[in-house]
Each structure stands twice: as structure tokens, then as C-alpha cells.
Amino acid sequence: LAQARAAAAAGEVPVGAVIVKDGQVIASGRNRPIGSHDPTAHAEIVAMRAAALVLGNYRLDGCELFVTLEPCAMCSGAMLHARLNRVVFGAADPKTGAAGSVLNLFDNANLNHQTKVEGGVQSGACSVVLQDFFRNKRNEQDQQKRALHPLRDDALRTPDAQFAGLPDYPWEPRYVSDLPALDGLRMHYLDEGPADAGRVYLCLH
């Protein structure tokens, strides 16, 4: 989690990883693709590269990798190639997760090496770090849009606090003001919520 927070502070998607051997952390990594201009620099890859240098071997026999987010297909393939004994992840990734969410590369008996995988460990804490990061990013983008597309003097300016009383509404409001059809007005909308939500609120003004 500390590595994930460090990634967020650097403007990267907050994912962190550590590699453990014989009960000791031998390497760590955080997301670095933006800063390093490297599409492969996911936290898991960074950590595995560091561990391989420590051990003097790309095969990480006897090692376990802990990561805050379910690994993608690229990272999962590298983990299998590195002969990791076990992979433990926190939050599931319903969009690119390759350890059970979208596909499961670890559940293929035809592969020449099998790596155990366990998910959901401290998933709540891991999810919060991600949610906070993307919420802040959306807020920054909304503020930039508002600055580029100021509201008309007669536009309604309902404070965000007015929506705080809606049941099951812990998410940040989102806005659109750059559509030509709005003509200087602002549309407020909600496009996220729990999968099992009993009601859907559409807020337009």
C-alpha cells in the first residue's frame, strides 16, 4: 500500500507490489509507465526486475509476490515465466484482471509451471487508494473543463452539498459543460454506483 500511495503521489495509477522470499521483503515496485515512458513498467514488473537482480536469476523460485491490484495479462504471464510460488492481490480488476476477473491465466493446467494465486487480501484498503486517485483525477478534469467553458450568468449553480442527502450516494458529482447543445449551461450527472443498487437516480439540471 505504501508503494501504491507513492505511485499516486507521482501521478501514476496507484498500484504497488512487493516480493517476499523466506519471510523477508527482497524487492518492491510501484507503477511507473508514465514517468518512465515504458508501457511494461507496471508495479509487478518493476518488483520482479528488482528481485531478479537481487537473486541473480530471472527465475524467482521460492518467492511470493503481493500486489494491491489484480495483475493484468502481461504481468500474469511474467509471473508464470518467473516461476513465482504464489501471487496475492488485493482489489479485483473487472476490466483487465487476468487472475479471475476477465480471464484466469493461472488456471491453465497445460502451462509448464503453476503459480498459486489468492485474491481479495485487504481489498477494501486497496480499493480506497484507487478510488481516491481516480476521484481526484476526475475532479481536476472537471475543473479544467469548467475553466474552459464558463457558465452563463443565468445558469443554475446548485452546490454539491445539495446531493449529499441522496441514499447510497458516496460518489463525487460529475459535470458536462462543453457540449455545444448546452449553450453555456451545465449538465450534472451520476454514472457510477454499486452493482446491486436497488434504485437509479438521474440528476439533470
Indicate where each model-derived feature is located.
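A short, polar/charged loop-to-alpha-helix boundary motif
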Residues: 35-46
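Short beta-strand scaffold segments in enzyme catalytic cores
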Residues: 15-23
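Local cysteine-cluster metal-coordination motifs and their immediate loop/turn environment
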Residues: 65-85
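Zinc-dependent deaminase
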Residues: 1-7, 80-151
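Short helix-loop-beta connector
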Residues: 58-62, 195-197
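Alpha/beta-hydrolase fold catalytic core
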Residues: 143-201
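Short beta->alpha transition motifs characteristic of CBS
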Residues: 26-33
